[in-house]
Every structure is written in structure tokens, then in C-alpha cells.
Regions:
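An amphipathic, hydrophobic-aromatic interaction surface with interspersed Lys/Arg
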Residues: 1-69, 141-234
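N-terminal leader/propeptide segments of preproteins
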Residues: 11, 24-126
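Short coil/turn linker and secondary-structure boundary residues
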Residues: 128-131, 189, 205, 213, ...
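Long, intrinsically disordered, low-complexity Ser/Thr/Pro-rich regulatory/activation regions
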Residues: 238-259
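Hydrophobic, aromatic-lined core segments that form the binding pocket/scaffold
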Residues: 79-184
């Protein structure tokens, strides 16, 4: 399922029919003292992306009792994630972190029950089972800016052949520099690096207020700033060399597709 871009950008929990409210965590929740820490967050994300084979390898690596019996064709990813007590509890913790409600395991029906928050009496509002587990995981990853069709930044529209030539020279230089860098030196989309870059160039966000953003909002701001910088460079080329192909509305093009 694809949530609306507007809804994901709002930062509010979003209701998934038959399940509950999914959410993108705020950066506050990832801090080492007041949150779960960045390392734990990465573990949670990795868990959401694991397929059946990854889970089997994890259970065997941890040497959980009974792990060797899970490699059966009749078991899907949800089954492998929940048949062993240790992995089932990890799965519950991970899913709960990206939801507004708490989860309780229902052994009789082999499913997670989604419990209403702040209810006077226990109230089930949804469930996560072997039939909707993949959809829930995919949607949670979307809210963390993973699995979205970003592609490259929208192509810059050149005003004339001269501006195109200058643009290609700049891009060629950047590509050449990137090839010279070692693998360790290549820019990474780590949250720490993105937070630092946004705080350095954004007119409003700084280290005092940026942690109020959700993960989705941070990545969106980062890619928007990157695209705007490309648009600004193209406008500078146009202002110096002119041309009749330049369109001022190019900066309005969305960076996300199919939303």
C-alpha cells in the first residue's frame, strides 16, 4: 500500500485498515539517551527488510533451539519470524516501535493483536498476521523513506547548448572526483551526515530544533535541498548565458514518483 505524500509529510500517525496507526519516528526517539539509539534503529530497519532466508540465517547464527526445523516450504516469512520465542519478541518490539499502539502475541491464532492506546479496558483494533505482514513491513519502510521511487533528481532543463555544455563539465568533474575517492570516503546517506548537512545549509533547521522532525521529514528536506541546489545552479547558468528553453517552474517538479 502507498500512503499519500501529504500524509507522510505531516508527521502524524497514519491508519492502515485492519492493522492500526503506523508512524515515522522522530529524530528525538533515535538519540542515545532519550531514545533507542541510532544502532538499534538500524537493526530495526534491517529486520523489516529481511526475507525468510535472512531470518533463517539469523536464527541459526544466534543458535536458537529449534532453528534447524524452520526451513520448510510451508513456512513464510511471518512464520519464521514468529515460531521461535526470541525472534517473535524481537519482531514484536520492532513492529511496535513503528506503531502508535502496542502489540500482544496471540498464540492460539498465531498473530499479533494491536491494542488500542489509552483505553480503559483492553481493546483490539487490528492485527498483524501471516497474510498482511509483508504489507505492514513495506508501509513502515515507506515511512522511513525506504522503498520509495526516488531515482535521481529530476533532470535539469537546459536553456541552450552552452548551458548544457557547462552543466556536463561540472557533472563530469564531480564524477571524476567521486571515482578517485575510496569506498570509505564516498558520501553516505547516514542520518548523522544528513542532519549535519541540512543544519549547515537550511535557513531554519539547526541542531537545536531539527530533532523534532520525523525521519521521513528529514530525508524529504535533504532531497529537496539537493534538488533546489541543482535548480539554482541551472538558473545561474541561464542568467549568464540566456536561452529560450529554460523554464522557471522546473523547481516545482516533485522528487518522489508515484505518490
Amino acid at each position: 500500500m502507498r500512503f499519500d505524500y501529504f500524509d507522510m509529510l505531516s508527521g502524524d500517525p497514519i491508519y492502515l485498515q485492519g492493522v492500526g496507526h503506523l508512524r515515522s519516528p522522530s529524530l528525538h526517539e533515535l538519540r542515545p539517551t532519550s531514545g533507542i539509539g541510532y544502532r538499534a534503529y538500524n537493526i530495526y530497519l534491517n529486520f523489516l527488510t529481511w526475507d525468510k532466508e535472512h531470518l533463517l540465517k539469523y536464527d541459526q547464527l544466534m543458535q536458537y533451539r529449534g532453528a534447524h526445523r524452520l526451513n520448510r516450504k510451508c513456512f513464510n516469512t511471518f512464520d519464521v519470524a514468529t515460531l521461535l520465542t526470541q525472534t517473535r519478541e524481537l519482531c514484536r518490539v520492532v513492529l511496535s516501535f513503528f506503531m502508535l499502539e502496542d502489540l500482544v502475541w496471540d498464540e492460539a491464532h498465531r498473530r499479533y493483536l494491536v491494542m488500542a492506546q489509552d483505553a480503559e479496558e483492553p481493546c483490539v483494533i487490528g492485527e498483524i498476521n501471516r497474510d498482511n505482514f509483508d504489507e505492514v513491513r513495506e508501509t513502515m519502510l515507506q515511512l522511513n523513506f525506504i522503498g520509495l521511487d526516488k531515482g535521481d533528481a529530476p533532470p535539469v532543463q537546459h536553456s541552450d547548448d552552452k548551458s548544457k555544455e557547462l552543466w556536463e563539465k561540472v557533472q563530469g568533474h564531480l564524477k571524476e572526483q567521486a571515482q578517485k575517492e575510496s569506498k570509505e570516503d564516498k558520501p553516505e546517506y547516514h542520518l548523522s551526515n544528513i542532519i549535519s548537512k541540512i543544519c549547515a545549509v537550511h535557513p531554519s533547521y539547526n541542531l537545536l530544533n531539527i530533532y523534532g522532525l520525523t525521519v521521513f521529514q528529514l530525508y524529504d528536506a535533504f532531497f529537496q535541498v539537493s534538488y533546489m541546489r541543482s535548480s539554482d545552479l541551472n538558473e545561474q547558468i541561464f542568467s549568464n548565458h540566456g536561452g529560450d528553453k529554460f523554464k522557471f517552474e522546473n523547481w516545482l517538479k516533485p522528487i518522489l514518483k508515484n505518490l
